[in-house]
């Protein structure tokens, strides 16, 4: 069995770090910036960054609708921070004036952008994470939280009483 080919959306965020972590875990990893690259992967990581900027880059590069289609067809995806925001079905405080964060609608959840406050309110701390033996060190920089998790969405972690990590569960799983 060959290693899965996992793409990392390379528009913003920790692209190199995600690519290296995937390789270390045994996956074949590649940056994704074009439609052909998107269509060549078995899964996708959407890193952190600025969700409105990432949304408009996806749109400008003609990746938004193809990505929505692939996700609707079951492409596995992981989203960190802005990536989690974009994977949501609904985004609160999405922006205005043509610079809104655009939901990919991959997970039935409502996410609030910048929920923990402004840059000056950033913090880090240890959080319990479902399925892991010990706490995970997490960094929250203008971070989102999940306001609503729909049916088929498993809550994985909370911080300061708010859901900060989820998994969308396939109906067949």
Curated annotation (Swiss-Prot):
SUPFAM superfamilies, sorted: Class I glutamine amidotransferase-like (SSF52317)
Sequence positions that bind L-glutamine: 49-51, 113, 141-142
Gene3D superfamilies listed in its UniProt record: 3.40.50.880
A GO cellular component entry from the record: cytosol
One annotated GO biological process: pyridoxine metabolic process
Domain of life: Bacteria
Active site: 81
One GO MF term: pyridoxal 5'-phosphate synthase (glutamine hydrolysing) activity
InterPro entries in the cross-refs: Class_I_gatase-like (IPR029062), PdxT/SNO (IPR002161), PdxT/SNO_CS (IPR021196)
Metabolic or biological pathway, per its Swiss-Prot or TrEMBL entry: Cofactor biosynthesis; pyridoxal 5'-phosphate biosynthesis
NCBIfam families linked: PLP_synth_Pdx2 (TIGR03800)
Function: Catalyzes the hydrolysis of glutamine to glutamate and ammonia as part of the biosynthesis of pyridoxal 5'-phosphate. The resulting ammonia molecule is channeled to the active site of PdxS.
Family: Belongs to the glutaminase PdxT/SNO family.
Full protein name: Pyridoxal 5'-phosphate synthase subunit PdxT
Record organism: Mycolicibacterium paratuberculosis (strain ATCC BAA-968 / K-10)
């Amino acid at each position: 069995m060959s290693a899965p080919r996992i793409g990392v959306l390379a528009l913003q965020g920790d692209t190199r770090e995600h690519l290296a972590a995937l390789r270390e875990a045994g996956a074949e990893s590649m940056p994704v910036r074009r439609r052909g690259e998107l269509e060549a992967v078995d899964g996708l990581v959407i890193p952190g960054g600025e969700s409105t900027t990432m949304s408009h880059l996806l749109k400008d590069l003609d990746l938004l609708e193809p990505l929505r289609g692939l996700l609707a067809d079951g492409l596995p995806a992981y989203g960190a921070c802005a990536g989690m925001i974009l994977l949501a079905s609904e985004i609160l405080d999405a922006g205005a004036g043509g610079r809104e964060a655009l939901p990919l609608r991959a997970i039935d959840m409502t996410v609030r952008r910048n929920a923990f406050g402004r840059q000056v309110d950033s913090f880090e701390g240890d959080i319990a994470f479902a399925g892991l033996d010990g706490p995970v060190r997490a960094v929250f920089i203008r971070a989102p939280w999940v306001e609503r998790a729909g049916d088929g969405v498993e809550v994985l972690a909370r911080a300061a009483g708010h859901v900060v990590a989820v998994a969308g569960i396939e109906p067949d799983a």
